[in-house]
């Protein structure tokens, strides 16, 4: 009986809050991975941010040993996956290392769009998908309806789905039995030349780069010289083992296993995710198919508050990119904010989390400008250029047409909220493509401009549907649109960090809202501050922050009116002079106001 038959690699697919991390905790407890004393809630969510927000961001892995009912001992390698739409690339990375996936569905809420998308990814990759109904301890659980939904919406047989409750600890053994029986064992040859796929890497201050790998063929031992295919560098393996969630050294990893490798790599880019590791003596081994590089969808300028932090900021970004392959950055300068970086993110949540991680883990103070998506511009010379920063948009005279990215959004919503969701999509300039009634739910398919989706669509969708609607979207194409750049001028000077690209129909109303909002946020000065929104040379709205002024008439009791006029005139001239030389400090909140302008 070969060792491979007793290995099962699986991951869990679930929507946010359907109980994925809690189920993982129960598996670890059942298999004795941690003693009760070390057990904490959501053991695998190791980042503080993950625990606070109750979401999983990074893929983690755990190796458990399970004594099955058939008397054999199985090695279960479980790779955790995130559930939020912004992190779907993490999911595809985790799935590439598995042969099976558990689809965890909340028995009260039913199937959500996110799980559907990830489930299709798993089925396309040829994984065995096992449905599990979680939260069966809730009084409002409806297993029959949810089973029907899984069959209707996803199309996999759910008759034998395990009924479990991770919180109450029921159905855990049944789930583990299903994994052993239904998930196929990995294929591979422990004696062939080594081929291992890097699923994830992160930087440890003491150990250098730690990589999570899945060995496809061959065996990797401590003390081996390895070759990293894309960088062609050779390294010596100093430590090798598995996570039981604690790091446990085993000295070797064989075909089919998942574990970590430390090879004293100090260069942050030494072990790129999706790369292949092989032994230095067999450099000709074919590279394994990696992952598709994810394209950032949202760009924003990120600047350190004090320019002394610029170098630390760059190092911090370097370390984060190692651990988060989808983060993209390049240096940028702004007149208003000095030196910083233009960063690309997968979505607004990703952007918030990166900013929070930078501020927490690296102790930086940052200012973020309004996020924009990438636009395509066709110039009069017939060149196509991509613009991810409104201040780099060419002069309108050179532009033949502008194209905005369009996404196809799939929305699942209960029938009661259908009207609200449709009117939200129409407000966001959406075009309905399809609509299907599935039991109590409705599946809507819309084409929407990405610029409208990434900003606040997700939050608005949740609020108009009381949290029941779920969303999944992917980029389809660029489409010509009537877009303009909206500039914000303060005392006649353009502030590059506040520029936006908007649709011409919304430009005037957006400009008005913005200037009103800025008026509240810019503190009063000793002179009037004019805040204007302009499209090209045309001013579409204006507000004024009134000057603070001393009461110069206080000393005139009674007295002649001409005396009062003279004093007021003198004050006016003083203010006028001051305005020519004065500069206005723009507070951090003002840059964020651009994001939070409600329609």
UniProtKB/Swiss-Prot annotation:
<protein>
    <recommendedName>
        <fullName>Elongation factor 4</fullName>
        <ecNumber>3.6.5.n1</ecNumber>
    </recommendedName>
</protein>
<dbReference type="GO" id="GO:0003746">
    <property type="term" value="F:translation elongation factor activity"/>
</dbReference>
<keyword id="KW-0472">Membrane</keyword>
<dbReference type="InterPro" id="IPR035654">
    <property type="entry name" value="LepA_IV"/>
</dbReference>
<dbReference type="InterPro" id="IPR006297">
    <property type="entry name" value="EF-4"/>
</dbReference>
<feature type="domain" description="tr-type G">
    <location>
        <begin position="5"/>
        <end position="187"/>
    </location>
</feature>
<dbReference type="GO" id="GO:0045727">
    <property type="term" value="P:positive regulation of translation"/>
</dbReference>
<feature type="binding site">
    <location>
        <begin position="134"/>
        <end position="137"/>
    </location>
    <ligand>
        <name>GTP</name>
    </ligand>
</feature>
<dbReference type="GO" id="GO:0043022">
    <property type="term" value="F:ribosome binding"/>
</dbReference>
<dbReference type="InterPro" id="IPR000795">
    <property type="entry name" value="T_Tr_GTP-bd_dom"/>
</dbReference>
<keyword id="KW-0378">Hydrolase</keyword>
<keyword id="KW-0547">Nucleotide-binding</keyword>
<dbReference type="GO" id="GO:0005525">
    <property type="term" value="F:GTP binding"/>
</dbReference>
<keyword id="KW-1003">Cell membrane</keyword>
<feature type="binding site">
    <location>
        <begin position="17"/>
        <end position="22"/>
    </location>
    <ligand>
        <name>GTP</name>
    </ligand>
</feature>
<dbReference type="Pfam" id="PF00679">
    <property type="entry name" value="EFG_C"/>
</dbReference>
<keyword id="KW-0997">Cell inner membrane</keyword>
<dbReference type="InterPro" id="IPR035647">
    <property type="entry name" value="EFG_III/V"/>
</dbReference>
<dbReference type="InterPro" id="IPR005225">
    <property type="entry name" value="Small_GTP-bd"/>
</dbReference>
<dbReference type="GO" id="GO:0005886">
    <property type="term" value="C:plasma membrane"/>
</dbReference>
<dbReference type="GO" id="GO:0003924">
    <property type="term" value="F:GTPase activity"/>
</dbReference>
<comment type="similarity">
    <text>Belongs to the TRAFAC class translation factor GTPase superfamily. Classic translation factor GTPase family. LepA subfamily.</text>
</comment>
<dbReference type="InterPro" id="IPR000640">
    <property type="entry name" value="EFG_V-like"/>
</dbReference>
<dbReference type="Pfam" id="PF03144">
    <property type="entry name" value="GTP_EFTU_D2"/>
</dbReference>
<dbReference type="InterPro" id="IPR013842">
    <property type="entry name" value="LepA_CTD"/>
</dbReference>
<dbReference type="InterPro" id="IPR038363">
    <property type="entry name" value="LepA_C_sf"/>
</dbReference>
<dbReference type="InterPro" id="IPR027417">
    <property type="entry name" value="P-loop_NTPase"/>
</dbReference>
<comment type="function">
    <text>Required for accurate and efficient protein synthesis under certain stress conditions. May act as a fidelity factor of the translation reaction, by catalyzing a one-codon backward translocation of tRNAs on improperly translocated ribosomes. Back-translocation proceeds from a post-translocation (POST) complex to a pre-translocation (PRE) complex, thus giving elongation factor G a second chance to translocate the tRNAs correctly. Binds to ribosomes in a GTP-dependent manner.</text>
</comment>
<dbReference type="InterPro" id="IPR031157">
    <property type="entry name" value="G_TR_CS"/>
</dbReference>
<dbReference type="Pfam" id="PF00009">
    <property type="entry name" value="GTP_EFTU"/>
</dbReference>
<dbReference type="InterPro" id="IPR004161">
    <property type="entry name" value="EFTu-like_2"/>
</dbReference>
<dbReference type="Pfam" id="PF06421">
    <property type="entry name" value="LepA_C"/>
</dbReference>
<dbReference type="GO" id="GO:0097216">
    <property type="term" value="F:guanosine tetraphosphate binding"/>
</dbReference>
<keyword id="KW-0648">Protein biosynthesis</keyword>
<dbReference type="InterPro" id="IPR009000">
    <property type="entry name" value="Transl_B-barrel_sf"/>
</dbReference>
<keyword id="KW-0342">GTP-binding</keyword>
């Amino acid at each position: 009986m070969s060792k491979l038959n007793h290995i099962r690699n699986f991951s869990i697919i679930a929507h946010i809050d359907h109980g994925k991390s809690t189920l993982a905790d129960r598996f670890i407890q059942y298999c004795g991975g941690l003693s009760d004393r070390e057990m904490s809630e959501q053991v695998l969510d190791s980042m503080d941010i993950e625990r606070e927000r109750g979401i999983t961001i990074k893929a983690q892995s755990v190796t458990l040993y399970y004594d099955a009912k058939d008397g054999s001992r199985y090695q279960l390698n479980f790779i955790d996956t995130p559930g939020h739409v912004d992190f779907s690339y993490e999911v595809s990375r985790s799935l590439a290392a598995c042969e099976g996936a558990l689809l965890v569905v909340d028995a009260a809420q039913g199937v959500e769009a996110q799980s559907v998308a990830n489930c299709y990814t798993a089925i396309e990759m040829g994984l065995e998908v096992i449905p599990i109904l979680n939260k069966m301890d809730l009084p409002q659980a409806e297993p029959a309806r949810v089973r029907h939904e899984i069959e209707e919406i996803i199309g996999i047989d759910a008759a034998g789905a395990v009924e479990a409750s991770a919180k109450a600890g029921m159905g855990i053994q049944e789930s583990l039995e299903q994994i052993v029986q239904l998930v196929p064992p990995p294929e591979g040859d422990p004696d062939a030349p080594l081929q291992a796929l890097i699923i994830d890497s992160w930087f440890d201050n003491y150990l250098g780069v730690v990589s999570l790998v899945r060995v496809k063929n061959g065996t990797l031992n401590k003390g081996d010289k390895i070759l990293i295919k894309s960088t062609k560098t050779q390294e010596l393996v100093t430590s090798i083992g598995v996570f039981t969630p604690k790091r446990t050294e085993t000295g070797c990893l064989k075909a089919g296993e998942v574990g970590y490798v430390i090879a004293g790599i100090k260069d942050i880019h030494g072990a790129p995710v999706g790369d292949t590791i092989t032994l230095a003596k067999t450099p000709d081994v074919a590279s394994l198919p990696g992952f598709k590089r994810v394209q950032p969808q949202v760009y924003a300028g990120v600047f350190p508050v004090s320019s002394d932090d610029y170098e630390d900021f760059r190092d911090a970004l370097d370390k984060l990119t190692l651990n988060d392959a989808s983060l993209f950055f390049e240096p940028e300068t702004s007149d208003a904010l000095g030196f910083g970086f233009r960063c690309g993110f997968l979505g607004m949540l990703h952007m918030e989390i990166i900013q929070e991680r930078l501020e927490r883990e690296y102790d930086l103070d940052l200012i973020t400008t309004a996020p924009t998506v990438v636009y395509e511009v066709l110039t009069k010379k017939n060149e196509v250029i991509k613009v991810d920063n409104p201040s780099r948009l060419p002069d309108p005279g050179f532009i033949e047409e502008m194209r905005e990215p369009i996404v196809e959004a799939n929305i699942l919503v209960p029938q009661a909220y259908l009207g609200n969701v449709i009117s939200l999509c129409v407000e966001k300039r959406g075009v309905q493509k399809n609509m299907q009634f599935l039991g109590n739910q409705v599946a809507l398919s819309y084409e929407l401009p990405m610029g409208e989706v990434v900003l606040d669509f997700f939050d608005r969708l949740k609020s108009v549907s009381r949290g029941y609607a779920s969303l999944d979207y992917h980029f389809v194409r660029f489409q010509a649109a009537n877009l303009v750049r909206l500039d914000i001028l303060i005392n006649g000077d353009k502030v590059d960090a506040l520029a936006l690209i908007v649709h011409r129909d919304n430009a005037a109303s957006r400009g008005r809202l913005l200037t009103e909002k800025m008026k509240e946020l810019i503190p009063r000065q000793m002179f009037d501050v004019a805040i204007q929104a302009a499209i090209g040379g045309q001013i579409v709205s204006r507000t004024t922050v009134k000057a603070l002024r001393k009461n110069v008439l206080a000393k005139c009791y009674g007295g002649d009116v001409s005396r009062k006029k003279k004093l007021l005139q003198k004050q006016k001239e003083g203010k006028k002079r001051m305005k020519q030389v004065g500069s206005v400090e723009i507070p951090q909140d003002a840059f964020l106001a651009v994001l939070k302008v409600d329609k």
